[in-house]
Amino acid sequence: MSILINEKTRVLVQGITGREGMVRTLLMKEYGTNVVAGVTPGKAGTVVHGVPVYDSVAQAVEKEGPMDASAVFIPAPQVKAAALEAMESGIKFMLLVPDRVPIYDVLEICAVAKEKGVRFQGPNTLGILSVEKAVMGMIGGSARSAKSWFKPGPVGVCSRSGGITSSMSYYLNQEGIGQTTICHVGGDAIIGLPLNEMVKLFEKDPETLAVVMFGEIGGSQEEEIAELIKKGEVAKPLVAYLGGRAAKSGTRFSHAGAIVEGNRGTWEGKVKALREAGVTVVEEFGDLPKVTKDVLARKGITATRKVEKPTGEKWPTAITKIEPNRIYLRGYKLDELMGKISYSQAVFLALRGEMPSEKVGKLIESILVASIDHGVTPPSALAALNVATTGASLTAALAAGILSI
């Protein structure tokens, strides 16, 4: 099974004719999502990737029948109106993709959703993907990538970071651990389905046997999970990694919802609460796959499958010459470079064949430091690759990768 969406979910796309709406509709359809209709006022009668477009949600429901879910790809100031329209037409699950939706708008959406029994994910979310069934949003970037990176298995994944959502799932799969559903809860201060609500949904899913999550400083989502475990409402094994260990009080970390205020929402406090509740918390992001495998094994859960190794690739090398006891990297003597240049300078040299200027070297160093706590993210790497293949400079490719985090 899965949570929230599956291959039978009838999906409506609000804002389907916009740039994001068109691109993400293609991803959703190619992955297998049952996208039934789209809505953009004034665009009725047009077709986007085979999906009929209507002027309103009510019109789409009248022509195509009841909808189960709506993916909202419209500017933040219009999100409230779109969400209220969707709920008025009987839609019971909404994915609110845009960030910076006004807080009071989100509060109103929350109130109406509670009254009508509607769930919504976001705002500021990458989306949700039920492996080999359906995707809403933009997880994976393309259907081809999503099908390659994410394989079925017994682990549910939820995260407060969009990039980490994909990264955790990708790295787990490299260890042979597949997923049921992958979800990014959203990065804003007020969201519809925080981590604690997602964990409760996974608890009720018979095919999800364990949960892996990425938490952050700020708010109380992680502490509320600890309380759920202590109350006996959550019993499945949970493995967690929390970002923001070095953040100081009063500073925002990564997302609008990640801010430490005094002693509230600190990294230390969250880790302590989770560990006291029995959650396995790892302190190094790269340890997640192995630790998850160990936790599953201790619970008697067989979660691993054979990982297919790619064959036949030919890898280029930056080594330009080999002599007895000496290797040349891009024409430079490697032993003379060691201890004299930084890691970022070495990367630039290997990729470009020349040493970076002082300005570019410092820029790359800053980018690497800023990325350490979040780890490498496949979507960011894909963005950098796409820009690089156009012939753009290495600096431009790096910038594209960072901007996609």
Labelled PLM ranges:
Residues 1-308:
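Catalytic-core regions of core metabolic enzymes
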Residues 304-405:
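Hydrophobic alpha-helical bundle cores within soluble ligand-binding/oligomerization subdomains
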